[in-house]
Amino acid sequence: MAEQKLVLERPLGQVALHLSVLQAFAARAVEKVEGVRPLHAGGGLKTIFASPEEGLHITLADDRVDVELRIAVVLGYPVHEVAQGVQQAVREDLEGLAGVRVGRVDVFVRQVIPPQEALVLETESEEGEENG
Amino acid sequence: MAKEEGFVSELGPEEGKVSISRDVIATIAGLAAAEVPGIAPPKGESFPRGEGARKLVDTQLAEGRVRIGIKVAVIYGHPVQEVTQKLQERIKQEIEKMTALPVEAVDVEVTKVVFPEEEPGGVG
């Protein structure tokens, strides 16, 4: 399947954003929110978002994008606030940085993770970043 | 007119003509892109020159006007619409200045986001 693109008409010509570019912005926005963790052990957010169906799904409409996210929240963090924080961060970065109009941002909280497990995940992903 | 001949500008019946190859135009576009803050080549450390530039830069001529298509990466943190607009302006400006060919449009395709910590070379 050809790479999907969001095409915006500008005075000097088209500006097309690949779907993977929008996904990268959304994934990075989620990482900024405290209390959010990857859905499964052993992978960072990026790993999960590498396969769009799993954690992050962006649908391109004519002039805007709709976002669907599946996240896990660390126990102890207020789930609703974290989810709202994710919605806000994703919307802000896609609008402010990518410069696209954002329609819906749907967040599905699929799991809560005990803090000690989250800690393990965090160390693992930090090590992974240093090696990569 | 053979396509490989390049873009021709007629200076006048007695002065002859100037032909500029696609590679030259593609290279100019790549060099212009390299100077725009927030824009990076989608692969490698610099925009390719010469024949290699054709992979990233598509040049078309219609009714005496040039249409450019360029693939780029955007460095994370820079507002995409702002830097792509600067890129369009810069490429149009440079090509018109250096080749005297009018540029009709510069189509930009953002294929990648580069996160500063992943950027080859690091601090720049």
Where are these regions (language model features)?
Chain B
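Contiguous, often N-terminal, cationic amphipathic patches that form binding interfaces
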Residues: M1-V80, Q85, L101-D107, T111-V113, ...
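Glycine-rich active-site/cofactor-binding loop and its immediate structural neighborhood
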Residues: K92
